[in-house]
Amino acid sequence: MARTILAFDFGTYSIGCAVGQDITGTAQGLPSFKAQDGIPNWDQIEKVIKEWQPERLVVGLPLNMDGSEQPLTQRAKKFANRLNGRFNLPVELQDERLTTVSAKAEIFERGGYKALKKDKVDSISACLILESWFEAQ
């Protein structure tokens, strides 16, 4: 039976979101959430969780290229803990190194420079995070 998973690309001003099913291993971008200094609109996130009814959540873990933590790493972990506390769903962290670079390259290939909108980048980054999580399972 297919399990629905939601993934988040945490950022201080925008949080990308994607949904996917483990049976296909593919993800689809959802609209990004605006955040104020890393604090999302929890009502919007709750709405998406109610709509998709995921069995688990995946949060991208921002790391430096050498694997060490960066200032955003702890904030992403805190966001993951809050998701777990608010929605009582299992939350896993997934290494997200290079997802933003890959997302920008993918968008640029499709639509050129004008297509590089922040919310699109965040949603595609969330897709890449989720697809890499599926591959690691």
From Swiss-Prot:
<comment type="function">
    <text>Could be a nuclease involved in processing of the 5'-end of pre-16S rRNA.</text>
</comment>
<dbReference type="Pfam" id="PF03652">
    <property type="entry name" value="RuvX"/>
</dbReference>
<keyword id="KW-0963">Cytoplasm</keyword>
<dbReference type="GO" id="GO:0000967">
    <property type="term" value="P:rRNA 5'-end processing"/>
</dbReference>
<keyword id="KW-0690">Ribosome biogenesis</keyword>
<dbReference type="InterPro" id="IPR005227">
    <property type="entry name" value="YqgF"/>
</dbReference>
<dbReference type="InterPro" id="IPR012337">
    <property type="entry name" value="RNaseH-like_sf"/>
</dbReference>
<dbReference type="GO" id="GO:0005829">
    <property type="term" value="C:cytosol"/>
</dbReference>
<dbReference type="InterPro" id="IPR037027">
    <property type="entry name" value="YqgF/RNaseH-like_dom_sf"/>
</dbReference>
<protein>
    <recommendedName>
        <fullName>Putative pre-16S rRNA nuclease</fullName>
        <ecNumber>3.1.-.-</ecNumber>
    </recommendedName>
</protein>
<keyword id="KW-0540">Nuclease</keyword>
<dbReference type="InterPro" id="IPR006641">
    <property type="entry name" value="YqgF/RNaseH-like_dom"/>
</dbReference>
<comment type="similarity">
    <text>Belongs to the YqgF nuclease family.</text>
</comment>
<dbReference type="GO" id="GO:0004518">
    <property type="term" value="F:nuclease activity"/>
</dbReference>
<keyword id="KW-0378">Hydrolase</keyword>
